[in-house]
Each structure stands twice: as C-alpha cells, then as structure tokens.
C-alpha cells in the first residue's frame, strides 16, 4: 500500500534517507502524519530499513522530481543536501516550506535545550556538558549532529537536551528557542558548499534565534551574536576572566580554571592536554552554569573526562616519542588548535601528518604555527600539493602516497621528546571511508612499529 499523495496540511516529504532522515520517518510515522521519502541516491543508506519497517511508505530514489516534491506543503531536507539544489529551490518558489529535523525537534521539545555549534570542538564540548548534567543528577539527552539524531531523543521525562548542531542542520532551523546557545569558534570550513566565510557565518548564527542566554568565545569575534542586548551573555577564553566570564587565572605560578574572580580547579587536573582542551573545558563550564548546573559536579566531570576518539587522542609512546590521533581535524581551524595546543605542551617538536580533501579551504594560516612548532610535515592525499604551496619552506616537507608510508616517515623523523601528530586539516573521503577509519588505520600503523 502506498501513502496517499493528496496534498494537505499533514503531508510531508522527507528528502534524504540517511541517519537523520530515518529519524524523521520514525517521528512522522509515530504521530500518524502522512509522508513520503525522496533521495537523490539510487541506494540511500537506510533504504532497506525503510522498506522493512515501513513498507507502506512511498519512496522515490534518483533525480528529484519537482512535481512530486510540490505535493507536500513541507519538505524535511537532509543536512547532507544543499538547499541550493535546483529541485528544492523550484519547490520553494512554488510555496513549499523547506525545513529540517532540528526545527521539528524544537517544536516538540518540552525541556530546555543547550545548543552548541562551531567549526571545531563542538563534539567534545557537547559530550562534556552532557556528562556534567548527568553528574548533577539531571535526566539528560545528548545528540543531534553527534551520535543520536535529535528527534530520537524526544521523551517526556527528559530534563535537559544537549545538542551538537552543524551549519547544515541550522540552515533549515528557523527558531530553535534554546535555553542557552553558543558558536564556539568560526574558521573556514565547508567552503565547497558555501559562497564564502560570511555565508557560513550566517548559517552558524541561526543557532541564536530565540535563545534565552548566549555563551560567547571572547577571543573569537565571529562567535558573538549581534545584538546580545536583553539576554544574559556569558563568555569564555584563555585569558583572565572578569564579570560573567570563565577563563584562566595564574596563582603562585599555577594556572587555574576560573569563574570571575573565583578559582575553580588547577588546569593540570584535566586529563586532556593542550590549551585547546582548556578552552573546551571553560566553554562547557559556561554552558553548564548558564543551564543552572552547580560547579561541584561539573568539575568532577571535567576531572574524569578522557577526551573523545580521534581528537588529539594519545595512541602510544615509542623511543621517547608520543603519537597522537587528531583525525577529526578535518579543517584548518581544528588543525591549528591541535598544533598550537599540543606544540606548546611538549618538550620537543611536532612531526605533523596533514592532507586529504581540503574542501576548498585556504591553508596559509598553518604556515607560522607549523614553522614554530613542527620539525617536519608529512603530506598525503588530494590536496597535498596545495598544502605544500601554503607551507612553503617553513619546515622540511615529505610527500607520501599512503598512511602507512606517512607513519614510517614520522618514525624516522621524530626525535626523543617530540610528538607525532595526525591532524590533517582536511576531510578524509579522498582516501578513507571517514575520519574514524583514517584515525584507526593511523593508530594501527603506529602500534605496529617495532
């Protein structure tokens, strides 16, 4: 049996049958809303699941049919599909609303939302805030762009939602109405999808629509919403904090995480290393504080947090050299954070592995930090030559074809006291299934060194 295609206020089409698309299917079906599914791919990832669990739902695969899309009054568009897709634009011109799973989630969520975006660190900070809330005894649900799709989190007993949100998800979100929202930082990313940094910036800042409180990185002007008047604004940064601010204070030669003029805990008690991880901890404290969490359980969560996989994750020590997997550094900003954060935290130098699919980004910002902190850079992947041009003669450059070759070169180049860092500044899809596979293979190769 096929879903009726009679246009009505209750007919929707889910465009894109991946993880978030399948969560939309479950949500709409559970509420008895008539819908169909479309996907530009002939074999979308969740097609078998849809046909098994919802055989009555009509699904169209392949090129999008505008007339078909216009039979609905609202399209829920997958984050992976650009809104500039001609068929979507034509449907919108004919009066069809373009929306997404986060907009639908916001309409139905009954508990406060902590909303987190940014070019980098959003998964780490989202996880931290979730763990802080759990330590505080809250019934908390964590997800969005990280882990569980937002719609699958909806439940009547939840006391707090903590969501990681991408710019792609925010493009289809008109009014999130978060209790507290933040853009942790902004640097070039997804320039293959956006016309430039201003368009990317605008997409990120949709997170602030309807937010009752905001958290701002005071060391990144692009993270500040305009205007902030009329709602509480908390800040975080690596400099000393003042009113309504979290930061670092030095007391008797030791650095402390601090709120206003109150020291909270020594920075050395964090298990994760580097200034960027101190910044992440301060951001999480600011968000948790804005959401009403007490300091004691938040600090306990910080002391226990060992970091996420593929985010400056320690792999092994060999001959006095530590190896780190930062495969999640899929853009320049993330790689900069790792190079500067880890580089300042070790005795020796970094031997960096970089390269992959640069997504149209500009790499010149890497030159000075690489010159300061790196002994050498091993390059691989599609944009290795673009990286080489940007780095120039800052340090010796070695070009390789495979990740195994990169690991072998690093083993030869690194000296005792150094660290080998996989922080590619690029996406992985030119050579690997995803950044997780890239990180696993790096750790496997490093672990196999005699």
Curated annotation (Swiss-Prot):
Pathway: Cell wall biogenesis; peptidoglycan biosynthesis. One of its GO terms (molecular function) is UDP-N-acetylmuramoylalanine-D-glutamate ligase activity. ATP binds at residues 118-124. One of its GO terms (cellular component) is cytoplasm. Keywords: ATP-binding, Cell cycle, Cell division, Cell shape, Cell wall biogenesis/degradation, Cytoplasm, Ligase, Nucleotide-binding, Peptidoglycan synthesis. Cell wall formation. Catalyzes the addition of glutamate to the nucleotide precursor UDP-N-acetylmuramoyl-L-alanine (UMA). This is UDP-N-acetylmuramoylalanine--D-glutamate ligase. It comes from Pseudomonas putida (strain ATCC 47054 / DSM 6125 / CFBP 8728 / NCIMB 11950 / KT2440). The gene is murD.
């Amino acid at each position: 049996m096929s879903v009726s295609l009679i246009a009505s206020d209750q007919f929707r089409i889910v465009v894109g049958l991946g993880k978030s698309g399948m969560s939309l299917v479950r949500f709409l079906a559970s509420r008895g809303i008539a819908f169909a599914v479309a996907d530009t791919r002939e074999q979308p990832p969740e097609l078998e699941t849809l046909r098994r669990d919802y055989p009555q739902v009509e699904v169209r695969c392949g090129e999008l049919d505008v007339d078909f899309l216009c039979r609905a009054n609202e399209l829920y568009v997958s984050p992976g599909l650009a809104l500039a897709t001609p068929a979507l634009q034509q449907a919108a011109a004919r009066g069809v609303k373009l929306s997404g799973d986060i907009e639908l989630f916001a309409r139905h969520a009954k508990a406060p939302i902590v909303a987190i975006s940014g070019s980098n660190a959003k998964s780490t900070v989202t996880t931290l805030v979730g763990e802080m809330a759990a330590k505080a005894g809250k019934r908390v649900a964590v997800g969005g762009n990280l882990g569980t799709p937002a719609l699958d989190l909806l439940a009547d007993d939840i006391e707090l939602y903590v969501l990681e949100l991408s710019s792609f998800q925010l493009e289809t979100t008109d009014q999130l109405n978060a209790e507290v929202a933040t853009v942790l930082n902004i640097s070039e990313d997804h320039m293959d999808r956006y016309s430039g940094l201003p368009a990317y910036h605008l997409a990120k800042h949709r997170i602030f629509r309807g937010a009752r409180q905001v958290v701002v990185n005071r060391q990144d002007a692009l993270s500040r919403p305009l205007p902030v008047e009329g709602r509480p604004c908390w800040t975080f940064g690596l400099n000393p904090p003042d009113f309504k601010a979290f930061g670092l204070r030095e007391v008797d030669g030791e650095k402390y995480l601090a709120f206003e003029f109150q020291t909270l805990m020594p920075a050395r008690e964090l298990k994760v290393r580097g200034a960027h991880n101190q910044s992440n901890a301060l951001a999480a404290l600011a968000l948790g504080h804005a959401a009403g969490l007490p300091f004691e359980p938040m600090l306990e969560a910080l002391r226990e947090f060992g970091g996420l996989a593929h985010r400056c994750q320690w792999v092994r020590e060999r001959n006095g050299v530590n190896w780190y997997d930062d495969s999640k550094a899929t853009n320049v900003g993330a790689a900069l954070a790792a190079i500067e954060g880890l580089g300042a935290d070790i005795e020796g130098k970094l031997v960096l592995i970089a390269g992959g699919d640069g997504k149209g980004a500009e790499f010149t910002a890497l030159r000075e930090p690489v010159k300061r902190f790196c002994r050498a850079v091993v390059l691989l992947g599609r944009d290795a030559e673009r990286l080489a041009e940007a780095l120039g003669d800052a340090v010796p450059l070695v070009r390789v074809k495979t990740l195994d070759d990169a690991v072998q070169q690093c083993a030869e180049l690194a000296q005792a006291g150094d660290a080998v860092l996989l922080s590619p500044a690029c996406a992985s899809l030119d050579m690997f299934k995803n950044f997780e596979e890239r990180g696993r293979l790096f750790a496997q190769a490093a672990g196999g060194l005699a």
